Amino acid sequence: GFFRNNYIYMNNLQTIIKLNTDPETKDRYASLYGDNNMQIAVAEIVKAWVFQLLTDYFGDIPYSQALDIVNYPQPVYDTQKAVYDGLIAKLKEAQTMLENSTTDGFETGDVFFGGDLSKWIKFANSLRLRLALRASNADPSYLTEAQDAIADGVMESNDDNAMFRFSSSGTPNEAPWYNGFY
């Protein structure tokens, strides 16, 4: 279901990170898909988004040991606060990585923002803002994080929305729900 499938999906994102950090593969993936740090940052942002959905839905979840099945075949459940703190830190790291990246080669592979790194930064900061506002209900000290996220730039209009646009008829991602079930 929802819980298991999201961890499977995040393993794909973790593979992107591994391929872009492994000395044996990182040059190849940079030449194919653009700056390594940019790819890592985008994967971390999407992972943060999915982890946030999971912890908001289930509360305590595997986070710190998740996605490392070799070393942690039964990962511990982290508290929601620990997950939120970890996600905020990862989103800040991703923002810094994007600010120091180039878009060369990424434009065609970016199905969310077409290679626009400024929109990825806004998305990361908007996720930080959402995490901080939700956590501030339990701990008002998170309001400082919310203010920092706003100052760093967040989504302000529908032009900034993160969405996957399906391709036209006959292309690989045409109607994936229909194609997956019929």
What are these regions (language model features)?
Residues 80, 84, 114-124:
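Aromatic-lined, polymer-binding surfaces characteristic
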Residues 104-108, 142-145:
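Short, glycine/acidic-rich hinge or "gate" loops at secondary-structure transitions
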Residues 70-71, 136-138, 161-162:
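Solvent-exposed loop/turn segments at secondary-structure junctions
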Residues 108, 112-114:
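Asp-box/WD-like beta-propeller blade repeats and closely related beta-sheet repeat scaffolds
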Residues 1-64, 68-105:
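Conserved, well-structured interaction surfaces
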